[in-house]
Regions:
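N-terminal exported-region signature
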Residues: 1-255
Length: 255
């Protein structure tokens, strides 16, 4: 059925649901609580501000179809692991229209990085890799992404970004609460890969829902290998490999 929300709806209290389409209109709001799933087969239309539809950390907005028919912005919250001041995390956005600097406004503007496939490095002028990463030094990079002020850069769909913690992030392990605002991504998404250099590409989940890794690899078997790599390391920890590896359903930890 087509669902219209005209009052406060919180899945933790009111339950998960599936709808053919979903409209949030005057007087209404939707919160998809942590570990809950809302499934919308077709389009989601939010007639209000992004704060009227919130997908909490570990909450799931699942959609079907091959096209993105969504209109209106929502808020999606995603937490990092417990990280230290000056740690880095790889992020991608589950919505369209989220500003890069607005996502972490107290991170220094020159501490947002893209990955260069041809050099296998992060950064622009003097790059660095993530194997045994401590504090990248020396590091010379323009103020922003590829010379563009970070204030003027939006997350590109399915593209991964390396972002350092805010300058005032605690020195003790603390979760960074990421918040994205924009039109939720849905449907089939195509990302242009590079074959330069080693051929590695930094991509991320573009949806406000999980991706089945085995299905992802099988559906893209003609274009990628069967190995996926996941990076997470704390500054100063050089005892382990920087990347975890998933290969044909087998997972190899870096810990």
């Amino acid at each position: 059925i087509d669902a219209i929300i005209e009052d406060v709806y919180v899945t933790a209290d009111d339950g998960e649901f599936t709808a053919k389409s979903l409209t949030v209109t005057t007087g209404g709001s939707l919160t998809v609580s942590s570990d809950d799933v809302v499934t919308v087969v077709g389009a989601l239309e939010n007639e209000l501000t992004s704060s009227a539809v919130v997908v909490e950390n570990n909450g799931v907005l699942m959609q079907g179809g091959t096209s993105n028919l969504n209109t209106g912005s929502i808020t999606v919250r995603r937490n990092s692991s417990a990280i230290l001041r000056q740690d880095y995390t790889l992020w991608s956005s589950p919505v369209a229209g989220q500003g890069l600097y607005a996502f972490s406004p107290t991170t220094l503007p020159n501490r947002f990085y893209t990955y260069n496939t041809s050099t296998n490095l992060y950064g622009n002028s003097v790059g660095f890799n993530l194997t045994g990463l401590q504090y990248p030094s020396p590091l010379v990079a323009p103020n922003g992404i590829n010379g563009t002020d970070t204030n003027n850069v939006l997350f590109a769909t399915a593209k991964g970004y390396l972002i350092r913690t805010p300058w005032n992030h605690p020195t003790a392990p603390t979760v960074f609460a990421g918040q994205f605002a924009g039109v939720p991504n849905s449907g089939d998404i195509t990302y242009t890969m590079s074959l330069a250099g080693t051929g590695f590409n930094l991509v991320g989940n573009p949806y406000p829902s999980p991706i089945n890794m085995e299905t992802f690899v099988n559906d893209n078997a003609a274009n990628i290998t069967t190995s996926l790599y996941f990076w997470r390391e704390t500054n100063g920890n050089t005892s382990n490999n920087a990347y975890c590896q998933w290969n044909d359903g087998l997972f190899q930890s870096n810990g």
